């Protein structure tokens, strides 16, 4: 016995299977090649063809049209068919025919009738209608083209569209991830400013001022800042005797002017000039605001009271001063309430920068935030230490 596997044998679907013919009560009305009508009794029937006897000879190969007639629940069921004569026996007039161009609904109806007859079930019109309503044939499988049918431009367009959709998706995901990260892991200050301790130079007498330095300029301790002029009458006010209060004497004293100089009390940078040149200033009025050059500028920021646990002393923060592109880092050194009597007031924090800030940045606004998210600084430090 040969048990070798024949590789040429493949699965045979029902549509390809040779159908056994069964004897079913049915009639066939058809037109022959001479357009004459014949009505015969079907001898046997299958989903692929039928046979019958006729007294009129038919030529093998002729394609004829006819109608199969069944009786189901005392109702007539007719199926229009087209068949080809495949064999003819002149001794008994038997014709074997094969169906041609049957519709899927007709094939399903024939299969149902034949299957019910073979199983011994009674054929009902309801079963036939149910068979006609459902799809009894599977769709043909789509063949994968693999892109071989696309032109070079079509492939380029497909790749471009795919890449564009991918880039947009990645950008949208990054935006959403960044927004969520900023919402849950970053505390933003409501306001911030670069602050330094300042020294005010005031006017010693009532008079006019003329500056000798520009704002932002550096000046040494004891160097002249500005000159001022005042009247002799103002100098002697309160020290005049009654004999010197005559109108002519007062007019003479008022016309005499004295000049003086304002000097710097420290090695400083001129932060602001509070009174313009040639303007009158009263005694004790601040004229200049100076910043000691040895002073390290700090950053002051205001946070919401709800963030008090996130901006404790020792917390690392990032800040950016207005007018600069560099993002600097620092550490919170103090934290206090703006108003100790008001329990709902905001929190004021002082930040010491990791690197010194130029004194010229004093008074500039700053954006401050505290990042509490996962950090990869330890991994970066290890990579730098190994020279990667």
Swiss-Prot record:
Transmembrane segments: none
Main location: periplasm
Source taxon at top rank: Bacteria
Localization per Swiss-Prot or TrEMBL: Periplasm
Annotated pathway: Glycan biosynthesis; alginate biosynthesis
Domain PilZ: 16-115
Keywords: Alginate biosynthesis, Periplasm
GO cellular component: periplasmic space
Molecular function in Gene Ontology: cyclic-di-GMP binding
Oxidoreductase in keyword set: no
InterPro entries named in the record: MFP, PilZ_domain
Alphabetical GO biological process terms: alginic acid biosynthetic process
PANTHER family per record: MEMBRANE FUSION SUBUNIT OF EMRAB-TOLC MULTIDRUG EFFLUX PUMP, MULTIDRUG EXPORT PROTEIN EMRA-RELATED
Function: Required for alginate biosynthesis.
Family: Belongs to the Alg44 family.
Protein name: Alginate biosynthesis protein Alg44
Record organism: Pseudomonas putida (strain ATCC 47054 / DSM 6125 / CFBP 8728 / NCIMB 11950 / KT2440)
């Amino acid at each position: 016995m040969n048990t070798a596997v024949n590789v040429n044998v493949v699965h045979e679907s029902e549509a390809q299977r040779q159908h056994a013919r069964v004897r079913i009560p049915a009639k066939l009305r058809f037109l022959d090649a001479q357009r004459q009508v014949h009505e015969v009794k079907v001898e046997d029937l299958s989903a692929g063809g039928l046979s019958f006897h006729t007294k009129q000879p038919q030529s093998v190969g002729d394609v004829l049209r006819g109608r199969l007639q069944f009786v189901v629940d005392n109702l007539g069921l007719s199926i229009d068919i087209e068949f080809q004569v495949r064999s003819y026996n002149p001794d008994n007039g038997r014709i074997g025919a094969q169906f041609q161009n049957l519709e899927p609904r007709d094939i399903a109806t024939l299969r149902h009738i034949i299957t019910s007859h073979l199983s011994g079930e009674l054929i009902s019109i309801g079963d036939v209608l149910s068979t006609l309503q459902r799809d009894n044939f599977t769709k043909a499988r789509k063949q994968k083209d693999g892109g071989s049918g696309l032109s070079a431009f079509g492939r380029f367009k497909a790749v471009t569209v795919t890449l564009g959709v991918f880039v947009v998706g990645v950008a949208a995901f990054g935006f959403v991830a960044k927004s969520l990260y900023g919402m849950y892991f970053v505390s933003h200050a409501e306001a911030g400013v670069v602050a330094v301790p300042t020294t005010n130079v005031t006017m010693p007498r009532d008079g006019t001022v003329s500056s000798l330095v520009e704002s932002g300029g550096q000046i040494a301790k004891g160097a002249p800042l500005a000159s001022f002029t005042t009247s002799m009458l103002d100098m002697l006010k309160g020290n005049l005797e009654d004999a010197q209060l005559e109108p002519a004497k007062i007019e003479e004293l008022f016309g005499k002017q004295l000049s003086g100089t304002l000097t710097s009390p420290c090695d400083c940078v001129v932060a602001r000039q509070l009174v313009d040149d040639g303007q009158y200033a009263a005694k004790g009025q601040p004229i200049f605001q100076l910043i000691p050059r040895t002073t390290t500028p700090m950053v002051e920021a205001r946070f919401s009271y709800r963030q008090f646990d996130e901006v404790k002393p020792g917390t690392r923060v990032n800040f950016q001063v207005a007018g600069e592109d560099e993002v600097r880092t620092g550490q919170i050194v103090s934290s206090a309430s703006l108003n100790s009597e008001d329990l709902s007031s905001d929190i004021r924090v002082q930040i010491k920068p990791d690197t010194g800030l130029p004194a010229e940045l004093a008074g500039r606004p700053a954006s401050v935030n505290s990042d509490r998210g996962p950090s990869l600084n330890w991994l970066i430090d290890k990579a730098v230490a190994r020279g990667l």
